A protein has these predicted regions:
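Extracytoplasmic gate region of multi-pass secondary transporters
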Residues: 37-38, 216-268
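Helix-breaking motifs and short loop linkers at transmembrane-helix boundaries and internal kinks
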Residues: 49, 81, 102-107, 136, ...
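Conserved MFS/SLC helix-loop-helix module at the cytosolic interface between two early adjacent transmembrane helices
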Residues: 68-107
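Helix-to-loop junctions at the C-terminal end of transmembrane segments
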Residues: 69-82, 269-282, 365-366
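Structural signature of the two symmetry-related core transmembrane helices
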Residues: 84-98, 284-299
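Cytoplasmic helix-loop-helix junction between adjacent transmembrane helices
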Residues: 112-150
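Helix-loop-helix hairpin linking two adjacent transmembrane segments in secondary transporters
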Residues: 137-138, 145-197
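A late C-terminal transmembrane helix in Major Facilitator Superfamily
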Residues: 337-370, 377
Length: 410
């Protein structure tokens, strides 16, 4: 038998110019907001006396915002250009945070979650289109760096929320810090935003890929895989602190801050997992990370003390770290020539999954307890493994030629 050599090709280096650093920081601010928002829901529930089901409606409102923007983004970018679209994302996210933190009415805080999520999704869609457009063959590595920074800055979110509660300033201060960062970013960006448009992001240009036409069946299965990954991540970021309070007896501020173990694991997973993606089939790596998430969940779920539970959360984070970048990358590849449309639809998948999965978990928790409700996590991961095995996606570039495996988003 003849051994088949494994070809490993080094991807082009990323030229980190000013626009790239601003895009990285934009993703970082979104990561900070996202991981600070999760523990804030449990604290808002305590403050207002909501049930878990009612409080989880804020996650559903966020999901709806992501779905709406996911459908409309490509049309807005074609009219305004990508640079103005990114600035609109900053303004929209800031407005949503002011609504969410500045009012006590349930309907207004739900509206704030919807608007903030819409703004955050605009940032994600804009940056995820800009980096590959701007960097060409080095785009996947730029994407990996951007999302790695998002997870790293996300570490600060739960800590800021927990610290605010601990020192008596309240949980809102940690979230409002996002607005300060957005203001600094937009001042640094300046008035000229054309550098963010690129060849396919200017309103006068034709779109880079056809916006219509049937997408292959494999794309929809790949999008379902991403939905499973997103649903799992949101279940843990939105309600993980509640599980720590229920099982480990942590206080509100300590539980919120302890989510840093989950987010930290995700950041480490994205950095440490990159060599694996360059040496093994990305589908195999993705399935393995789902298995690792189940292992971490088992450690946390069977424990009733802070130490082992936090170890379990860190292992869960290691598994989750690579899942979203890999799942997004394989969905875009599976779109076969409609990459822009495929990227936009992944935001829809994320919105649907992040709205449905945490809501189901919260509803079950109100009736059976949060510990039992969290069994949704291994169920989602097993479903994800089966989907990856059922519909593998070869590593190809936009025109269908084989590319090095280390050119997949890591």
């Amino acid at each position: 038998m003849t051994d088949v050599p494994v070809r490993i090709v080094t991807a082009p280096a990323v030229v980190r110019d000013r626009a790239t650093w601003l895009a990285y920081f934009h993703i970082g601010l979104f990561g900070y907001f996202l991981y600070a928002f999760g523990p804030s829901i449990a604290l808002l529930r305590d403050e207002r006396g909501y049930t878990r089901t009612v409080a989880s409606l804020h996650g559903s409102a966020m999901a709806l915002g992501a779905v709406v923007v996911g459908f409309l983004a490509v049309h807005v970018v074609r009219r305004t250009g990508r640079g103005p679209f990114l600035r609109m994302g900053s303004v929209t996210l800031a407005a949503g945070l002011l609504l969410y933190t500045g009012f006590s009415s349930l309907w207004v805080t739900l509206l704030g979650a919807f608007v903030a999520s819409g703004g955050g999704t605009m940032i994600m869609v804009g940056v995820n289109a800009f980096l590959p457009d701007h960097h060409g063959p080095a785009g996947p590595r730029a994407m990996s760096e951007a999302h790695g920074l998002g997870a790293t800055m996300g570490l600060l979110g739960p800590l800021a929320v927990g610290l605010g509660v601990a020192i008596g300033w309240g949980w809102r201060v940690g979230l409002l810090a996002t607005i300060v960062g957005l203001v600094v970013l937009e001042i640094a960006r300046g008035r000229n935003t054309e550098q963010f448009d690129g060849p396919h992001g200017h309103p006068d240009d034709e779109p880079g890929h056809a916006p219509h036409g049937p997408l292959p069946r494999r794309f929809w299965l790949a999008m379902a895989v991403f939905g499973v990954c997103a649903g799992t991540e949101f279940c843990l970021t939105l309600w993980g602190s509640d599980l720590l309070r229920d099982r480990a007896g942590l206080g509100a501020s300590a539980a919120a801050a302890s989510l840093v173990t989950l987010v930290g694991g995700m950041a480490v997973g994205r950095v440490a997992g990159a060599p694996l993606v360059s040496r093994f089939d990305p589908d195999h790596v993705l399935a393995a990370t789902m298995g690792l998430t189940v292992v971490g969940f088992t450690i946390a779920w069977l424990s009733a003390a802070p130490g082992p539970m936090l170890v379990g959360f860190a292992v869960i984070g290691l598994g989750l770290g690579l899942q979203s970048p890999l799942a997004i990358g394989r969905a875009v590849i599976a779109a076969e020539g409609q990459a822009d449309r495929g990227a936009g639809l992944t935001s829809v998948a994320a919105g649907l999954a992040s709205g449905i999965a945490p809501f189901v978990l919260a509803a079950v928790a109100d009736h059976l307890g949060v510990h039992t409700a969290f069994l949704i996590v291994p169920a989602l991961m097993v479903a994800g493994i089966l989907l990856v095995r059922a519909a593998p996606v070869p590593v190809t570039d936009a025109v269908g030629d084989a590319v090095p495996t280390d050119a997949v988003p890591d």
